[in-house]
Amino acid sequence: MAQGLYVGGFVDVVSCPKLEQELYLDPDQVTDYLPVTEPLPITIEHLPETEVGWTLGLFQVSHGIFCTGAITSPAFLELASRLADTSHVARAPVKNLPKEPLLEILHTWLPGLSLSSIHPRELSQTPSGPVFQHVSLCALGRRRGTVAVYGHDAEWVVSRFSSVSKSERAHILQHVSSCRLEDLSTPNFVSPLETLMAKAIDASFIRDRLDLLKTDRGVASILSPAYLKASQFPVGIQAVTPPRPAMNSSGQEDIISIPKSAFLSMLQSSIDGMKTTAAKMSHTLSGPGLMGCGGQMFPTDHHLPSYVSNPAPPYGYAYKNPYDPWYYSPQLPGYRTGKRKRGAEDDEGHLFPGEEPAYHKDILSMSKNIAEIQSELKEMKLNGWHAGPPPSSSAAAAAVDPHYRPHANSAAPCQFPTMKEHGGTYVHPPIYVQAPHGQFQQAAPILFAQPHVSHPPVSTGLAVVGAPPAEPTPASSTQSIQQQAPETTHTPCAAVEKDAPTPNPTSNRVEASSRSSPKSKIRKMFCEELLNKQ
């Protein structure tokens, strides 16, 4: 076991700025108290019960305050030797230097120096006690450039610092050589291993510790080879290492362990993100998807480059001007704007053993809803519900159709009667029906003022009874068709009520204002259920 080791390094560098005011030592004020030739305790991490040696002098040099000392505690040196025997870093080879496991472990464990002194504000006055209390070996000093170098020879230690001039080096070595290690008292090293281990664990969490040690070595200007780990890394092991369990080629850094539930959640989120959604269709001016053309319906032409153009309407068809005041674009049954269609379920994969596909739950829920709808239908049949009579003519069916749009020429807009002229409210423009002899007759306008209807108006040919007669128009003058105003002054409502037969009080009546259509109710319930499933 070594009788003693020398340590040397800067405890303050003048040219290096300080981040905290308490760390700044004014060279003009400190010079009055240097050099310090009396021995000061050398401790570990500023712990009072960890004295491991004594300082041999604090000297003022051009680069800062340089410290030299000796580690003479037998207990600490024995502990450091045991650590070096079991440390792989201590047995790593070093270029251009002999193998020294003890020096390697000290440079790895305690590579920094820290000076304990009074506060700089008290230096302006005459201090009542000593200015410097002790020097500590630590994992990283608070002042930059305070890095330690350990060695068996004091001259070798001081020669590692190129920032110390030859004259300053000679002055330091002259004083160190006059000190005998045998004359120094035995340090009081009684610190338990738990305290030292706790300090070592705390040092492992210092952020960018290795980079800061490299900076300290550069600030101290240590250019000669040394045992510092700030610039050299282990490249191999000189001893035979014990066998270890086999590991994958990917290494421990590439392998992580997470709970199964978290992995399944991440996988499901990734699958949901990969599902493509349907592109939104552009809003057209002619209705949600279809436009009327006589008695036929043609799809609208969406102006999207990815879609193939739709077939054109028949010859002679005139597109309706969407900006006319009476233009109405109905909503087709079963069409929902702004809703995404449910995509087909993937039955091939993305399921783990023991998992239940999501669409099974949807099927069970929809089956339950269908059963409820069937029970409601049976209840309606038991209550004796009967539908009203259907329309008796094509003109009347066109009049009550909420999805009808007329065929008209946008180049010659027609003038239709207003609400004040007939006393009723129009839902759509009047309907033009072509007679067999090539003439047009005007159908009766649709009115809201009939709460009870038992029989529809009787039609004669293609003209509705009660409608104002239309004068015949020659076939040659069909370029511009204009509406004929009614000749009589009575309202169409009165004509309908006059010609309609007297309703039978015993017949079934359908109150449109108090009872809704069961078909609409069922459709609404089914649509709401599908919306909730989206």
Curated annotation (Swiss-Prot):
Alphabetical list of Gene3D superfamilies matching this protein: Herpesvirus/Caudovirus protease domain
Keywords, comma-separated and alphabetical: Host cytoplasm, Host nucleus, Hydrolase, Phosphoprotein, Protease, Serine protease, Viral capsid assembly, Viral release from host cell
Enzyme class per UniProt: hydrolase
Biased composition (Polar residues): 479-491
Residues of the site described as Cleavage: 230-231, 512-513
Domain of life of the native organism: Viruses
GO annotation terms (biological process): nuclear capsid assembly; proteolysis; viral release from host cell
Region spans: Interaction with pAP: 253-272
GO molecular function: identical protein binding; serine-type endopeptidase activity
Region feature Interaction with major capsid protein, mapped onto this chain: 514-534
Region spans: Disordered: 337-356, 466-524
E.C. number(s) listed in UniProt: 3.4.21.97
InterPro entries: Herpes_virus_sf (IPR035443), Peptidase_S21 (IPR001847)
Positions of short motif Nuclear localization signal: 336-342
Catalytic site positions: 46 (charge relay system), 114 (charge relay system), 134 (charge relay system)
A single cellular component GO annotation: host cell nucleus
Family: Belongs to the herpesviridae capsid scaffolding protein family.
Domain text: Region of interaction between pPR and pAP is called Amino conserved domain (ACD). The region of interaction with major capsid protein is called carboxyl conserved domain (CCD).
Protein name: Capsid scaffolding protein
Gene: ORF17
